[in-house]
């Protein structure tokens, strides 16, 4: 039997997280928050919590897309930025990741080392996550903001993130909330249903799916982790 996780009180959770974010920003003597909006539920909730904590004028949303980013995700990132009414920019990371491939001469290297395609795919996917982290910190430095992480408890517990990529941040406000609990909170906090219900994916390569990679649905995973 799959265990259903207890529902979190959305009002109490919001107050607690808002206090945590405000204290962290104030301790850092920072002026605001940069959030990478991917168009998914985790970053949408993180953006919402940032705005609730600091006001929309102190939050910058950035969507960093590549050729493998699903069009729907770009649409949802824009939708979220509009709903939150925050400053928002879109940056393509394709040129930067292509430059990396040229510099590392990946094609010749593969013939030398016999690296299989899957390994290359994962290395390139992780590279994209790390490029995104670098861009978030670049904008954070320019504005004296901190970078908000978007990792949930389910992913953090099993290590389903890129070290120094999406794992590179100053604060993880949803890091204590399991994915299935987050879906219910997102509903209460007014995150659009389209964003909540679409299959979770990182868009690091074509047709990527979180649950395929993990090998379990988040319902099963959370029931095991909890």
Language-model region placement:
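Catalytic subdomain that performs nucleotidyl-dependent activation
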Residues: 82, 119-132, 146-217
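Generic structural signal for individual residues within well-ordered alpha-helical segments
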Residues: 14-15, 183, 222
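ATP-dependent adenylation/nucleotidyltransferase module used to activate substrates
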Residues: 1-157
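Generic signature of intrinsically disordered, low-complexity segments enriched in small/polar residues
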Residues: 23, 140-142, 163, 167, ...
């Amino acid at each position: 039997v799959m265990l259903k996780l207890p529902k979190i009180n959305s009002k109490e959770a919001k107050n607690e997280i808002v206090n945590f974010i405000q204290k962290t920003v104030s301790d850092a003597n920072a002026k605001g928050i940069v959030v990478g909006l991917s168009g998914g539920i985790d970053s949408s909730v993180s953006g919402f919590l940032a705005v609730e904590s600091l006001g929309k004028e102190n939050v910058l949303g950035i969507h960093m897309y590549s050729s493998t980013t699903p069009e729907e995700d770009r649409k949802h990132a824009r939708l979220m930025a509009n709903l939150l009414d925050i400053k928002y920019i879109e940056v393509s990371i394709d040129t930067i990741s292509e430059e990396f491939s040229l510099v590392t001469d990946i094609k010749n290297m593969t013939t030398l080392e016999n690296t299989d395609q899957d390994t290359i795919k994962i290395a390139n996917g992780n590279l994209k996550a790390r490029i995104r982290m670098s861009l978030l910190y670049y904008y954070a430095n320019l504005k004296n903001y901190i970078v908000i992480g978007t990792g949930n408890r389910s992913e953090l517990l099993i290590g389903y993130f890129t070290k120094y990529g999406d794992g590179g941040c100053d604060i993880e406000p949803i890091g204590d909330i399991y994915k299935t609990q987050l879906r219910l909170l997102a509903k209460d906090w007014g995150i659009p249903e389209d964003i909540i219900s679409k299959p979770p994916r990182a868009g690091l390569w074509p047709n990527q799916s979180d649950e395929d990679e993990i090998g379990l649905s988040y319902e099963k995973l959370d029931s095991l982790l909890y």
